[in-house]
Curated annotation (Swiss-Prot):
SUPFAM superfamilies: Class II aaRS ABD-related, Class II aaRS and biotin synthetases. GO terms for molecular function: ATP binding; histidine-tRNA ligase activity. It comes from the Bacteria. InterPro entries: aa-tRNA-synth_II (IPR006195), aa-tRNA-synth_II/BPL/LPL (IPR045864), Anticodon-bd (IPR004154), Anticodon-bd_dom_sf (IPR036621), His-tRNA-ligase (IPR015807), HisRS-like_core (IPR041715), HisRS/HisZ (IPR004516). Keywords: Aminoacyl-tRNA synthetase, ATP-binding, Cytoplasm, Ligase, Nucleotide-binding, Protein biosynthesis. Disulfide bonds: none annotated. NCBIfam families: hisS. One of its GO terms (cellular component) is cytoplasm. It holds the Pfam family tRNA-synt_His. GO terms for biological process: histidyl-tRNA aminoacylation. This is Histidine--tRNA ligase. The lineage of its organism: Bacteria, Pseudomonadati, Pseudomonadota, Gammaproteobacteria, Moraxellales.
């Protein structure tokens, strides 16, 4: 038997209903903030991610699903490992920043070659949010406030903890990088193997090492905050002031750096202690240089207009839906959602009348989910009704047609009664979704 690939999971109907419920709440909050939905390709040119994410990141070095297509000459392509790079590519390609400050969101599968474990899969799903055009700290605070409202709507507000840091500007970060490398070079024999590798490729990622011995070495290491300029400090302080005004609690985590090279200034994560090692549910930050960086790359490759490139500020976040659903199962379980409210059973001799009744009910009561079985025996149809999860079963035979009535069976109590054919058309008589 052919099975799903390791780390790629089917989402079956019972679970899919919970996904739709979660996605509808998140989409509702995004709409309340005026964000617009964009649909992006799941395959992009490999070079896009190498330029945007950074060639020395774990994602680009060892986690991407890449292949070469059949074009002439062949083009290296990659299943998207994250969404921001594609969103920036789309904004640049379609000139969405011309006279506007787009606020966009997208949802869909991402792909990374990682060791599958609970809450982390090779195909996983994210909702991503990107706000373009404002360099001011209120844009950072708005995104964080939005996620705070999402947690409240999902019943998760008390289970989330917000961690903040500032990465400053690129020159400030480079100065800090040199100081950190100098400090750790003398102690590299005490570093874990992964951190030794990162010392020469991406030393800031050592800060979020999970190894206790490495964290002990970092206690006396130079602090990034000491390398920030006045403007970066003022920006970060204003973000904190806005969050305080909004009543959103936070912690400063000086080791929070994020795994992607494009971030600057504010970075943040929402974490929980309910999911073990998979503690981060949502993460994001500011990336003011990425729009211009990708435009500049196009100019170098002869794909742009060769005009001087001015970058545009941007800030965004992404949250993993698998982890969010896991957290909800632990602290705020979503009730099972039956696929059917009313099941219509019709005697084979009057089955066409049953089809007409069910169709009329679907037109008249769009709030109800109405199912029918095929034109088999009444006994076989009732077995299907029992398994459907329906609250009511409507039974139609010749007697009901002659009397212009329906028989209604309460599937929970087993009680059965006769009612007028239009009884279910009145919401006051039955509504499962109050």
């Amino acid at each position: 038997m052919i099975k799903a690939i390791k780390g790629f999971n089917d989402i079956l109907p019972a679970q899919s209903a919970k996904w739709l419920y979660l996605e509808s709440i998140l989409a509702n909050v995004l709409g309340r903030y005026g964000y617009e939905h964009i649909r992006l390709p799941i395959v992009e040119q490999t070079d896009l991610f190498a330029r945007a994410i950074g060639g020395a990141t774990d994602i680009v070095e060892k986690e991407m699903y890449s292949f070469t297509d059949k074009s002439d000459p062949p083009t290296p392509l990659t299943l998207r490992p994250e969404g921001t790079a594609g969103a920036v590519r789309a904004v640049n390609e379609h000139n969405l920043l011309r006279g506007d400050t787009p606020k966009l969101w997208y949802i869909g599968p991402m792909f990374r070659y990682e060791r599958p474990q609970k809450g982390r899969y090779r195909q996983f799903h994210q909702i991503g949010v990107e706000s373009f055009g404002s360099a001011l700290p209120d844009a950072d605070a708005e995104l964080i406030a939005m996620t705070h409202l999402m947690w409240q709507e999902l019943g998760l507000k008390d289970e989330m903890r917000l961690e903040l840091n500032s990465l400053g500007e690129i020159d400030e970060r480079h100065a800090y990088r040199e100081a950190l490398v100098t400090y750790l070079t003398d102690k590299q024999e005490q570093l874990d193997e992964d951190s030794k590798r990162r010392l020469t490729t991406n030393p800031l990622r050592i800060l979020d090492s999970k190894e206790a011995s490495t964290q002990a070495l970092l206690v006396d290491a130079p602090k990034l905050a000491d390398f920030l300029g006045e403007e970066s400090v003022a920006h970060f302080e204003q973000v904190q002031a806005y969050l305080t005004e909004l009543g959103i609690n936070f912690e400063i985590n000086p080791h929070l750096v994020r795994g992607l090279d494009y971030y600057n200034k504010t970075v943040f994560e929402w974490v929980t202690d309910k999911l073990g090692s998979q503690a981060t549910v949502c993460a994001g930050g500011r990336y003011d240089g990425l729009v211009g960086q990708l435009k500049s790359a196009d100019n170098r490759d002869g794909k742009g207009d060769n005009k001087p490139v001015k970058s545009e500020p941007a800030v965004g976040f992404a949250m993993g839906l698998e982890r969010l659903l896991l957290l909800m199962e632990v602290v705020a379980p979503i009730a099972d959602m039956p696929a059917c409210d009313v099941f219509v059973v019709a005697h084979p001799e009057v089955y066409s009348a049953g089809i007409s009744y069910a169709q009329n009910l679907r037109y008249s009561r769009p709030d109800l989910r109405v199912k029918m079985a095929s034109a088999t025996s009444l006994k076989a149809q009732m077995k299907k009704a029992d398994k459907s999860g329906a609250a009511l079963t409507v039974i139609i035979a010749q007697q009901e047609l002659d009397d212009k009535t329906i028989s209604i069976k309460d599937m929970q109590t087993g009680e059965q009664k006769t009612a007028a054919q239009d009884w279910l058309l009145d919401k006051d008589n039955f509504s499962r979704h109050k």
